[in-house]
């Protein structure tokens, strides 16, 4: 090999035209193996993929990912645990072909019943791990370098914005409900600012600037699986921003601050204190709290009314705000700034929901102007 060590290679056949002995599994001939070894040595490709298995390669890749966000690290663990149970994880990396990678992902969806988004996350770890192997001269090509949607069915449900009428009906229901009215101000703010839920949870009293009628957004609050509270930078570089407030939004914030419970000990997370909402343990509320509250609100609404309300989450509130602003004619670059998107294509394509009625209204507006 390239280290000068002598190694042996075996095959049941000398030449590719020789017959395979009866009962033996077909494999490359000795001459074919010799050519492959010579080519690998010439190109400085490490023979046998360095003897790494798929699992070992992914573990090495993850071990080198220092300085990433805690939720990114949390996403690696399920992939490693799954590979420990899968025979695919024990394959030597140089034995994995493009067709093997595709067949495995198809198996995950069609046999194991995994969803598209789950498989997308799995491939999101394996592709860069195998690319690391290519960069390290362990492999010639990356077997996971292909368009995922061309291999498995995208069965993920698109998170749609709700209509203006649905938004009005939902907010009216929350405001008038004896139990859920306590959450009205917060949900109104989510619908009318487009804040990410972790940004909203991270807000402190000092960041609501009533004089300037703006909200300072420079961090987000998250809670790990180990129940540890952490402060993270916003999701993108453009996430640090000031979000303007309307009078109605400002009124909601004033009521929230006025009604804010006074804890025995003010919780502090990495230097931040004065969080707007605290739970029963006097700790800051996180995204999971609001997701559950909204889930219960929708369940009660749909038990009462015949016309059902679709699933509404804090992120749907963000979609809805963006969609409403776009339909109202807001400049796309202004909307990108308010949303904190790094790429304007996300603003235009992912969050903006336009249907036929919107198109019809716009055509009539231009025709009559």
Which residues does each predicted region cover?
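N-terminal core-binding DNA-recognition domain of tyrosine site-specific recombinases/integrases
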Residues: 22-26, 50, 62-140, 156, ...
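Basic, Lys/Arg- and aromatic-enriched nucleic-acid-binding interface segment
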Residues: 120-122, 139-141, 145-203, 210-211, ...
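Short, basic (Lys/Arg/His-rich) helix/loop patches that form interaction surfaces
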Residues: 172-183, 193, 243, 259-268, ...
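N-terminal DNA-binding module of tyrosine recombinases/phage integrases
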Residues: 2-102, 258-272
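Catalytic-site neighborhood detector that most strongly recognizes the C-terminal catalytic loop/helix
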Residues: 153, 161, 220-221, 339-364
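Conserved tyrosine-mediated DNA breakage-rejoining catalytic core shared by Y-recombinases
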Residues: 149, 203-261, 267-268
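DNA/chromatin major-groove-contacting recognition/catalytic segments
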Residues: 170, 226-231, 328, 349, ...
């Amino acid at each position: 090999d390239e280290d000068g060590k002598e190694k042996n290679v075996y095959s049941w056949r000398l030449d590719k035209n020789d017959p395979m002995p009866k009962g033996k599994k077909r494999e490359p001939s000795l001459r074919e193996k010799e050519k492959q070894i010579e080519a690998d040595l010439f190109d400085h490709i490490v023979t046998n993929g360095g003897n790494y298995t798929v699992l070992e390669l992914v573990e090495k890749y993850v071990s080198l990912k220092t300085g990433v966000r805690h939720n990114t690290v949390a996403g690696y663990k399920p992939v490693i645990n799954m590979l420990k149970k899968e025979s695919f994880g024990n394959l030597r990396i140089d034995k994995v072909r493009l067709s093997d990678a595709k067949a495995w992902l198809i198996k995950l969806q069609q046999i194991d019943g995994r969803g598209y988004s789950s498989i997308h996350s799995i491939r999101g770890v394996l592709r860069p791990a195998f690319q690391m192997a290519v960069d390290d001269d362990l492999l010639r090509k990356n077997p996971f370098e292909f368009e995922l949607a061309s291999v498995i069915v995208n069965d993920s449900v698109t998170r749609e914005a709700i209509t203006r009428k649905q938004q009005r009906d939902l907010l009216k229901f929350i405001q008038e409900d004896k139990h859920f009215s306590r959450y009205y101000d917060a949900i109104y703010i989510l619908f009318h600012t487009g804040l990410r839920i972790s940004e909203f949870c991270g807000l402190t009293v000092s960041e609501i600037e009533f004089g300037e009628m703006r909200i300072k957004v420079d961090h987000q609050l998250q809670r790990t699986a180990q129940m540890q509270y952490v402060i993270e930078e916003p999701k993108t570089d453009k996430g640090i921003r000031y979000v303007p407030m309307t009078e109605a939004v400002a009124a909601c914030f004033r009521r929230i601050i006025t009604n804010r419970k006074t804890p025995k000990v003010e919780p502090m997370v990495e230097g931040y204190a004065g969080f707007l909402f605290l739970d029963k343990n006097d700790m800051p509320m996180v995204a999971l709290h609001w997701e559950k509250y909204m889930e219960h609100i929708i369940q009660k609404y749909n038990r009462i009314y015949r016309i059902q309300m679709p699933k509404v989450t804090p992120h749907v509130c963000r979609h809805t705000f963006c969609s409403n602003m776009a339909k109202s004619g807001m400049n796309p670059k202004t909307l990108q700034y308010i949303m904190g998107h790094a790429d304007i294509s996300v603003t235009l394509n992912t969050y903006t929901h336009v249907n036929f009625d919107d198109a019809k209204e716009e055509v009539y507006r231009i025709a009559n102007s």
